[in-house]
Amino acid sequence: MVFSAFPRSGPPPRFRDYADYAEVVGQLERSGCIADYTHIWWDIRLHPRLGTVEVRICDAATRVEDAVAIAAYCQAVVKQLCERYEAGEEIPSYHRILTSENKWLTARYGLEASVMDLATRRRNRVPVARVIRRTVAEITPHARELGSERELEGILEILARGSSADRQLQIYNSNRDIVEVAREIADATETLPVSV
């Protein structure tokens, strides 16, 4: 959230197409505002040299399994959106104020957040966990095609047990010892499951 005070950060703007994106980035480069596209810090950005989409919105996962689950989730969402785009479907676009508000709510309250359900446009906020579960159900066929269905199920495991941040808060609240929190982070980070 602190980073959002900088230019070229936060939710990305909507572009008509890749040429529109390239023109904007080119203007920033030609004017000397940025050295290259890596100086754009949107929550989601293209990495043209690698041909990838970088999702830069969530905290680093301390558990390898969580990082893999988040990657599987992002891959399946991108695959779903690409297929919809290629089929000529309208891709939903939400006002930056609304997406920024949801970002704030989840940064502040984590998996306990209640957010605006932008896809259904419900009037009341809903638990973010419900939105995540629905999205997992929608993207599971895409994860299956990518060979990452099992990894995607890790998202549901995170919802069941809590995130790395939840675990860190639990440890700190139990003994008020930041060293124990650091130890937990180190232990979780060093433990590499055999299946990954």
What positions do the PLM features span?
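C-terminal accessory/tail domains of diverse enzymes
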Residues: 3-196
